[in-house]
Swiss-Prot record:
This is UPF0367 protein ssl1972. It comes from the Bacteria. HAMAP family: UPF0367. It comes from Synechocystis sp. (strain ATCC 27184 / PCC 6803 / Kazusa). Belongs to the UPF0367 family. InterPro entries: UPF0367.
Length: 93
């Protein structure tokens, strides 16, 4: 599984969706980056291939970062790369 994690402005936790194939993850990454670079905000509707009932709609001008990372069986239960310290801070509060 490949995870696409979006960091949103004013939100401490990322929004994540997964893709089964690397090509699908790369295509979604490019779609998100293109939307972020656009002059006009647009709604991005994302679905998840791991949890097929999971859907999220996000305004492109609210995305501050996109991280693509491959998950193996052991890592998928762990923390998202780049967000581990943030998760620890939130859990302590």
């Amino acid at each position: 599984m490949i995870s696409i994690d979006l960091t949103l402005k004013y939100s401490p936790m990322p929004v994540s969706v997964q893709r089964k194939e690397k090509d699908g993850a790369e295509a979604l990454y490019q779609t998100i980056v293109t939307a972020m670079q656009g002059d006009r905000p647009q709604v991005l509707e994302l679905t998840c291939e791991k949890q097929t009932e999971k859907k999220v709609a996000i305004m492109s001008d609210q995305i501050s970062a996109v991280i693509v990372s491959e998950k193996d069986g052991a890592a998928s239960a762990g923390k998202v790369p780049g967000f581990a310290a943030l998760g620890q801070i939130v859990n302590q509060g």
